[in-house]
Amino acid sequence: MSETVTVDSMKPQQIERETRRTQLNRGELAERIARAVPRDGRAEPLKGLRLLRVSSPTEQVHSVSDPAFCVIAQGSKEVLLGDDRYQYDPMHYLLATAELPIVSHVIEASQERPYLSLSVKLDPTLVGSVMVEAGHVSPRSHADVRAINVSPLDASLLDAVVRLVRLLDTPAEASFLAPLITREIVYRLLVGEQGGRLRNIAVQDSHTHRITRAVEQLRKELDQPLRIDDIARELGMSVSSVPADR
């Protein structure tokens, strides 16, 4: 009985320590990104790691998403994909699993507290390798085929992100350790809430992969009449599944 009471009495302390660690990590992440990008703009200090600083809310920007894991250290952002809107902040991460046209804009940013974020590019080969090593099987269904979604950023995933950014201070170590921490991030994503979606990018015949191929083909044929039926037939998809701005 006394042992149970002791364990129960530790729970609030554990929660408090975890909360404190998360707060410290968020603060450190913002500080390190601000130091790495001292003025508004982008930087890629490590291969596949992109940093962004913005000092005021932005207008909507049209771009093409890459498969990437995105974290905000300070501020907030909204991403639009078709009719869907995804808003995230330092307590959430965004996972993009396909190369698709999106619209995005920074919502919360100021000179005193600029928008600070990072993204880690996700290589399908790396995802597949981590899946094999971790013993994850490929998804058998495509229940969630959304190319973008937002989830809570847990303490373990945030901790790995902070360790990756710390490597900016030690370039000699970064070349060896950055790939290892990136693998850890991929692993934690695979076992997390969006693991099923992430596994799709490593499967060559997945719905997400076919959508990406369709977009790539549309890009190559911008100067040609749009033939949705032909593209759908070639990719083995239904006409309604092929992305097009109709």
Label each PLM-derived region with a short phrase.
Residues 1-45, 50-52, 58-60, 140-146:
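A short, N-terminal "cap"/entry segment at the start of jelly-roll beta-barrel domains
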Residues 61, 174, 178, 203, ...:
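Residue-level marker of regulatory loop/turn positions in helix-turn-helix DNA-binding domains and
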Residues 208-212, 240:
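Short alpha-helical elements of helix-turn-helix
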Residues 41-138:
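N-terminal regulatory/effector-sensing and dimerization cores
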Residues 61, 93, 214, 221, ...:
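Localized chelating/binding microdomains
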Residues 8-28, 127-184, 188, 196-200, ...:
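Amphipathic alpha-helical segments enriched in hydrophobic/aromatic residues interleaved with Lys/Arg
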